[in-house]
Regions:
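Helical scaffold of the NTase/Pol beta-like nucleotidyltransferase catalytic core
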Residues: 1-28
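Short gly/ser-rich loop at a beta-strand->alpha-helix junction or flexible surface loop bordering the NTP-binding
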Residues: 24-38, 134
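Short amphipathic alpha-helices in soluble, non-transmembrane regions
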Residues: 62-66
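Short, surface-exposed loop/helix-turn segments at secondary-structure junctions
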Residues: 101-112
């Protein structure tokens, strides 16, 4: 049997609930992060991207492995991609959180990406307030490399003004 290659809105909401239950600080990122900023699903998503407090990496991995996820790609401390037959792909990114609200993420060359505090926020989606990367953060996170066709709209995203 093939792998689940699409994560649905229902999968997303289950993953959000899972993270809320861990008590670990997190933010939704990636394609689903853009979609909740837009207030609706705009395309099909292969995975769910979550940035989280790096000091809880082992705790989070234990929770996910106990729920049936298996590690698919291990690029610690940069990212870890996991797979669940039920919920599909989950790409987690450990962030070191600073007291002033800024953060940093390890890069593949042994350095760091530095992030401003206004890259992090929350949005109301499907009856819940969900921590997510802000529009400004999404634009910065998706700069510096060539976007896939389905992601080009990220840089043109504007939010409703209501």
């Amino acid at each position: 049997m093939g792998r689940k290659e699409i994560t649905t809105k229902e999968d997303l909401m289950k993953v959000i609930e899972l993270f809320e239950n861990t008590g670990i600080t997190y933010w939704l990122d990636g394609g689903w992060g853009v979609d909740i900023l837009a207030g609706k699903q705009t395309r099909i998503h292969r995975d769910i991207d979550i940035n989280f407090d790096a000091q809880h990496t082992e705790k989070l991995l234990n929770v996910l492995l106990n729920l049936g996820y298996k590690i698919d790609t291990d690029w610690k401390p940069v990212r870890i991609e996991l797979y669940s037959d039920e919920l599909g792909y989950l790409d987690i990114h450990p962030f070191v959180l600073n007291e002033d609200g800024t953060s940093k993420q390890a890069d593949l060359e042994g350095g760091w990406y530095e992030f401003e505090k206004d890259y992090f926020g929350s949005v109301f989606f499907e009856g819940k307030t969900i921590p997510c990367i802000s529009l400004k953060g999404q634009k910065v996170f998706h700069s510096g490399y060539e976007l896939r066709d389905k992601a080009v709209s990220y840089t043109h995203l504007t939010l409703p003004t209501n």
